[in-house]
Every structure is written in C-alpha cells, then in structure tokens.
C-alpha cells in the first residue's frame, strides 16, 4: 500500500516551520505595517510570504521524498 503525500507532508511541514521563524517574523512585521496603510491598495507582503514558503519547502523536500520512495 502506498503512502499518501498529504498524510506525510503535513507533519513534516509543521516540524519545518519552527526552523523558519525568521521568515515568519518578517512576514508578520510586514503584515502589521501594511495593515496600518489604510489607503495604499498596492502594498502587500507577497515577497515575505513567498520567502517563508520557500524556507519550509527547502526543509520539507528531502524529508518528504525520502519517505515516499
């Protein structure tokens, strides 16, 4: 029986998130700044969010594929 990627990936992501606290803090700081800008519709934190996702993905990738082989 094959292991589902979704069942394996979730717990690995949660474990990897603790190693990406710096990028998460940067995203939260940006989010706080953007929330204060009431009239600036172009302001967003997409860059910081993508950096956080990339950090988690770099950690998850090797661990996930090792389990799915």
Curated annotation (Swiss-Prot):
Disulfide pairings: 16-59, 30-45
Against Gene3D superfamilies, the record matches this protein to: Ubiquinol-cytochrome C reductase hinge domain (1.10.287.20)
Q: Which UniProt keywords apply?
A: Disulfide bond, Electron transport, Membrane, Mitochondrion, Mitochondrion inner membrane, Respiratory chain, Transport
Q: Give any single GO term for biological process.
A: mitochondrial electron transport, ubiquinol to cytochrome c
The cross-references to InterPro entries, in alphabetical order and at most eight, read:
Cyt_b-c1_6, Ubol_cytC_Rdtase_hinge_dom, Ubol_cytC_Rdtase_hinge_dom_sf
Please tell me one Gene Ontology term that the record gives under cellular component: mitochondrial inner membrane
Chief location bin? mitochondrion
* Membrane topology of the entry: Peripheral membrane protein
Where, per UniProt, does this protein localize? Mitochondrion inner membrane
Could you tell me what this protein does? Component of the ubiquinol-cytochrome c oxidoreductase, a multisubunit transmembrane complex that is part of the mitochondrial electron transport chain which drives oxidative phosphorylation.
Give the quaternary structure: Component of the ubiquinol-cytochrome c oxidoreductase (cytochrome b-c1 complex, complex III, CIII), a multisubunit enzyme composed of 3 respiratory subunits cytochrome b, cytochrome c1 and Rieske protein, 2 core protein subunits, and additional low-molecular weight protein subunits. The complex exists as an obligatory dimer and forms supercomplexes (SCs) in the inner mitochondrial membrane with cytochrome c oxidase (complex IV, CIV).
**Similarity annotation:** Belongs to the UQCRH/QCR6 family.
What this protein is called in its record is: Probable cytochrome b-c1 complex subunit 6
Q: Which organism is it from?
A: Dictyostelium discoideum (Social amoeba)
What are the top taxonomic ranks of the organism?
Eukaryota, Amoebozoa, Evosea, Eumycetozoa, Dictyostelia
Q: Which gene encodes it?
A: uqcrh
